[in-house]
Amino acid sequence: MGKVSKSTKKFQSKHLKHTLDQRRKEKIQKKRIQGRRGNKTDQEKADAAGTREQQQLKKSAKEEVFKDMSVETFFEKGIEIPKENKKLKKKTTKEQSDEDSSSSEEEEDMGQSMAKLAEKDPEFYKYLEENDKDLLDFAGTNPLDGIDSQDEGEDAERNSNIEEKSEQMELEKEKIELSLKLVRKWKKQLHDSPSLKLLRNIISAFKVAVNLNKEENIEDYKYAITDEKAFHELMFMVLKDVPQAIQKMAPYKIVKGARTLPNGGNVSRVSSIVKSHAGSLLILLNDITNTETAALVLHSVNELMPYLLSYRRILKELIKSIVGVWSTTRELETQIASFAFLINTTKEFKKSMLETTLKTTYSTFIKSCRKTNMRSMPLINFQKNSAAELFGIDEVLGYQVGFEYIRQLAIHLRNTMNATTKKSSKINSAEAYKIVYNWQFCHSLDFWSRVLSFACQPEKENGSESPLRQLIYPLVQVTLGVIRLIPTPQFFPLRFYLIKSLIRLSQNSGVFIPIYPLLSEILTSTAFTKAPKKSPNLAAFDFEHNIKCTQAYLNTKIYQEGLSEQFVDLLGDYFALYCKNIAFPELVTPVIISLRRYIKTSTNVKLNKRLSTVVEKLNQNSTFIQEKRSDVEFGPTNKSEVSRFLNDVAWNKTPLGSYVAVQREVKEEKARLMRESMEEQDKERETEEAKLLNSLESDDDNEDVEMSDA
């Protein structure tokens, strides 16, 4: 007896009793319905039909055998056997006797003729006995005697047929060698008369091509590829010609700027073929090594997008793979190609793709920016800018997604602050700051500042406020909380990095953010109040690609000089935002007073010289604004006129603006020289590695030659 399945056990324990009870009730109800007057079955109606005599005969036939007598009386009378029809009996016996007599007569006649043959021609009779004895065996045979031998023959024949079929299946399973001639034949058929069968064969061969490196899967496929030319021809044909053939077989329509498939026709069958083809495209996307291949594959996927929109899982995997190419490649051109695909398809198929693309892009970006250095920073900045543009496609959806992720950042900050202040927190207070003080968290804050800067520019809004503008306040609050979490000199690089993102946000959105207090705290820290240590062997600290100062640089002269340089640059960048503002003199007056006081008490000559230059430029710009506003006839309440003040003057034509522009050029020149030196170092390292590989290969070749000589 087979094992009882789990579903059967479940039915027996829960539903069996109820089912049996229900069947009993139904049976009783059926009997009641049949017992009612007029509710007769077909058999009962047939029994009721006929004459009265026929009904009495039927009734008497159904009566019991022992009616009106006992068992003993019945056996005493004896058993009466019903009489057979004599005519029928005579007929059947006569037929049987005729058959038996005819067969026996034939046997007797045959025996007599053989006896006469033996008398007349004994030599021929002897010849028959020696060569064909079965011919003389003329006795009657039973036809059932040959059944066993016949069955054995049929079994042998059946087994041979099965063997032939299995051999045929093995022959069919033999792989088809993909030749260049076959590929070109397929290509011609694609252009002339594409069909579903042809598409299936091509896609099956393409699946073999993309899985050549996976030996465990090769045995399952119909085709085998050994010709390199056929391989390349197949790849180009599938990526270029197959999408065009699919569009011929199931053409789409453009409705409201988006490609839409009609109902009916070959759409469902073609879409199922494209669905199976998507798996090969995913493998190809994950193995992209150069820009040319990336552009070709992405173009092919773009052509097939209308046929994949109904398959949500495959669509999600495609987005994930393309975003993976966008985030992991080190080639800028490949990044641009993948970003172009994402922004074009999300604009066209906004409802189907945009939300998934935004969430996948952000999560993938955060994972990829864990390690940040001089080499990876340009690519990370490109990812930030391109992803920020994606969030501007639909600002309502961008607000929903952005609110969710900024809220997560605020929760992380709150948990960190609770861990450092409350003893009941489950997080280790000594390690809690690492949740916030890392590159991923800082890049995330900087990314959202770029998103809001891109979407909340007054020129773009044109009088209608962007929904994303509501996220500026919570983002600024989280950023300020992160800056002031640990106000020690060790994390001043992180402070500078986040201040730059706040300056960018204030510049593009027009929102005033009080940044000077964050900068002034640096001047009163131990980095400037304590006497620095000498460090002749240390290089200049890289504030652009670090958020934490190492112990080797703390309290050193070179670190202090780097802090003073960063302070002056950020101070100039911040006040350059308001260098044309009509209220600039009132804005900088407290700053000028505090800086002059600091210069009087400070003994750092280099810092004092830099601060004096900044104070001088602030005073010059303040005088410039006072001269320009002396002729205006509007008051502070007239906001439209205030916003148009000095619109015809470029920011770098002001005293402070020209100073900041020169400082930025010097800074950019230093960064360019550092990048060039880094690229030269990379090239030297690559050449050394190539030489080392060549030397190792030559050594291996020499060893092979020595072994062959031996």
Swiss-Prot record:
One record GO biological process: ribosomal large subunit biogenesis
Gene Ontology annotations for the cellular component aspect, listed alphabetically: mitochondrion; Noc1p-Noc2p complex; Noc2p-Noc3p complex; nucleolus; nucleoplasm; nucleus; preribosome, large subunit precursor
Keywords (A to Z) from UniProt: Nucleus, Phosphoprotein, Ribosome biogenesis
Feature: compositional bias, Basic residues: 1-17, 25-38
GO terms assigned for molecular function: mRNA binding
Assembly and binders: Interacts with MAK21/NOC1 and NOC3. Forms a nucleolar complex with MAK21 that binds to 90S and 66S pre-ribosomes, as well as a nuclear complex with NOC3 that binds to 66S pre-ribosomes.
Protein name per Swiss-Prot or TrEMBL: Nucleolar complex protein 2
Annotated function: Involved in the intranuclear transport of ribosomal precursors.
Superkingdom classification of source: Eukaryota
Subcellular location field: Nucleus, Nucleolus
Family: Belongs to the NOC2 family.
Acidic residues bias (residue ranges): 97-110, 697-710
Post-translational modification Phosphoserine, affected residues: S70, S149, S160, S166, S698, S708
Residue ranges with Basic and acidic residues bias: 76-85, 156-169, 672-691
Note: Present with 29000 molecules/cell in log phase SD medium.
InterPro entries assigned: Noc2
Region (Disordered): 1-64, 76-114, 138-169, 672-710
